[in-house]
UniProtKB/Swiss-Prot annotation:
Protein's name in the database: Small ribosomal subunit protein uS10
Organism: Delftia acidovorans (strain DSM 14801 / SPH-1)
Stored InterPro entries: Ribosomal_uS10, Ribosomal_uS10_CS, Ribosomal_uS10_dom, Ribosomal_uS10_dom_sf
Family: Belongs to the universal ribosomal protein uS10 family.
Subunit structure: Part of the 30S ribosomal subunit.
């Protein structure tokens, strides 16, 4: 698996959870002898929703809600077979979305 790179992209609503997961991935990869670049924080995406408070009148009175999606990006350069096996066995929290690409 020489001359390859694994790109890992993490997404979560909770920044503490995503930082903890990124630290676990970095520790696992370094323990197996791979070179890790990152985690790089990507821009946080915010979705905002305006909802009427009253069902009938008072159009100017509204509630505002937002969802923040935090993202991190990591590259693992020259992964070994041990690195891939360790990453596959890694147990991450349920609130973290993981995308893995081989390049």
């Amino acid at each position: 698996m020489s001359k390859q790179k694994i790109r890992i992209r993490l997404k979560a609503f909770d920044y503490k959870l995503i930082d903890q997961s990124a630290a676990e991935i970095v520790d696992t990869a370094k323990r197996t002898g791979a070179i890790v670049k990152g985690p790089v924080p990507l821009p946080t995406r915010m979705k905002r929703f305006d909802i009427l408070r009253s069902p009938h009148v008072n159009k100017t009175s509204r509630d505002q809600f937002e969802i923040r999606t935090h993202q991190r990006l990591m590259d693992i350069v020259d992964p070994t077979d041990k690195t891939v096996d360790a990453l596959m066995k890694l147990d991450l929290p349920a609130g973290v979305d993981v995308e893995i690409k081989l390049q």
